[in-house]
Amino acid sequence: MIPTATYRLQFRNGMTFDRAAALVPYLKNLGISHLYASPIFTATKASTHGYDVTDANEIEPSIGGREGFERLVAELKAQGLGLIIDIVPNHMASSLENAWWRDVLEYGKESRYARHFDIDWSRRLTLPFLGDTFDAVLENGEIAIKPDPATGKPAFAYYDNYYPLAPATWQGREAEILALTDKAAIADLHERQPWKLMSWRDAARSLSYRRFFEVTGLVGMRVEDKTVFDDTHRLILELVRTGAVDGLRIDHIDGLADPKAYLARLRQEVGPACYITVEKILAKGEQLPDDWPVSGTTGYEFIASLAEVLVDDEQIDNLRQAYETVKGAPVDMRAELRAAKLLMVDRNFEGEFTRLLALALSIASELQIAQEESVVRQALRELLIAFPVYRTYGTAEGLPPTDICLLHRIVERVKTLETPPQPEALTFLSRLLTGDVPASSQEEATQFRVRFQQLTGPLMAKSVEDTLFFRQNMGLALNEVGAEPVTHHFSIERFHHEMKTRQARQPDALSGTSTHDTKRGEDARARLYTLTEAPEQWSECLARWRQMNQTHVKFLNDGTAPKSADTWMLYQALTGVWPPVLQPQDETGLNALKTRFEAFVEKALREAKLRTDWVDSNEAYETAMLDYARYLLAPDNQTFLQDFYRSLQPFIRAGLVNSLTQTVIKLTAPGVPDIYQGSEALNFSLVDPDNRREPDFATLAQQLDQLTPGVFSREESWLNGQVNQYVTAALLRLRQQNHELFRFGDYIPLRAVGQRADKVIAYARVNHDDALIVVAPRLVFAECDGLLSQSHSGFWSGTDIIIPGQLNQHRYRNVLTKERLMPGERLSLASHQGGVLVLMSD
């Protein structure tokens, strides 16, 4: 069954199955068809998100276990709602809490699970969980031989962790082993284990297993092996087959060795009715492979499409110039992207790159092709850096035709570099990737292809989303998962084109605007888009605020903190997160915001990897930056706070109009709208873990029944999210009543004419005799200096929407105001408050 709308709920951190069951009546009333659950399987005890699974065949006891899950399912079914769960086939926790992993540690290559995990068994399994080298930790007395409290067997004890010994190294002399205190003897015992403990700092260069991105605590799984697939999906398949679960969201599909084969096997097991979406980041213009048996993506590309509507393309260059003036230098985003990718290849993914290089050189040697290591290294490095998408989808048979064309374009681009790699090396690597090698080397070439494809995705994610987007802060709203790193022109025409393509290619994909992974909540993003409409006003504000807080800038050995570019980021981030109802005198509210903002600032600085890093933190710099950030929100900093609050008002109001437009589009454009918990009202969250905070469900449920069209005329209803919640509920119910229109209806752009024609977006959805007309405002910052609740009919005077022949014969009902009208050939906006119209044909 294809959902009409999903509601993402984050379990753990207090959210249990029973608490979720209590929310089901609210979700039904809101108009949701399917609850969309974060991972529910047993994860590490400290897990806050559930992606660090320790047992894929057990439901997490701390959130209610199997019995609690069954109660939730029963309540969902009683209310007529379905359930979608988030599954994680790519990885599990490399934790001692994981019985399979623990078995591998104890028995090494002889473990029944040795091939479940993606481990390089040509060497000892590396465990990068020490604070220093093994020798240093041993010398400091931090490690010893003790009985494991859980099993009683001898183990290497490091604080609260007990690493099991291989049976052959202790059985028959248990007392002797437990009595070991001599450091040389302990070191010798360590050398005889199938694993080796090492410093976490050495993971990037020495890890012997595939990890999720840079997270050593998450080990890759070999689900391409049927045994591994069966073992990791036993409970998942049971839940689908028994009808408890109606859909699956596949986490990090690009991490798998063969996504297509995995999805084909999964589809065969769950049947045609199961709704399947994949977490897949698509570049602009990129589409999912046609032969994947899924309904579509989880929708990050939809966020990027919305920017086409809400960014002022005519003024964004002025914002860019202002940013470069503050920064003190022009920004070459292509060069910045290259620098970020170089850092990832050379440092953060050094081990993965080295393994890939060694594999290529081994194949060259087998084929007796003369290739110098330095030459192949440069060619491989440049290919990885030049990759414009997350990955290709080659198999043992080679690359599909579209990916071969992509590879050829990349190679040609690499050849134009100022210092290009040798053509022979590029040709050799291309042959490995396309499978153009003798039969004797096909297996190794396939392995190279798989490893290459499993590296390009993490490389792209960590260099763009988690480095570049924290370094270059011209427009934080554009620094989002799924966004293009190199700024392009924005246009409604492109948005219309992308929606037509979406309707044709993946009409059942999720359309998300906030997730647990987005860099900021959808309404923070909507507000920050308005900076592109008023770059001069923003620049004047920034200069004034910097001057007000200048005395809190510190002078350090490596420069000032914050630097001018840092302040651009800080004030813009604060602009995005500031709650609309927060007053400068509200000390409690300021302190709550300060706690959230501090955590964001620390993460933003470390992700940028410029003056501090997760690997080597710069304490002096971080302290200075955090002190500055705290002062911004200090209750006694009233001169700044009053000015900030006053200056923010037009941005807040224009942002709320953007929020409404964004909501209307999400609920009426092609795709299945996904509501992230609490986002039916307003979501001004920062990057995780801030975006995983639980919303006030009690208030949301209580106010829903009280909402009427009158919310548009109450200023407080705009500021507290009631307008968005009312519109969300009204349109979700409309979707339920007109499922086929929204699923199959054509997407038809409508033309605006008149004085404010560039200030609206308009389109229709048409399926047989059913028609929907949607009109929403955009780029109205200049009109938002007054109250949102005021009528702005004068602003829209003389602006009409041209209604084509197949639509202008209908009578329509305004879904948001309940009025009825027959627009004819021209729909005048002057008589409709705010320019927001959702008209459903009678």
Where are these regions (language model features)?
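Carbohydrate-interacting/catalytic domains
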Residues: M1-K45, V53, N57, S62, ...
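Hydrophobic or amphipathic alpha-helical targeting/insertion segments
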Residues: L72-I119
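Hydrophobic "anchor" residues on beta-strands that sit immediately upstream
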Residues: G82, G247, Y275
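Long, basic N-terminal domains or extensions that often function
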Residues: I87, E110-E176
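Conserved short loop/turn motifs at secondary-structure junctions
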Residues: N90, I250-L256, E716
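Intrinsic-disorder/coil detector with helix-boundary
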Residues: W101, I145, Y158, Y162-L165, ...
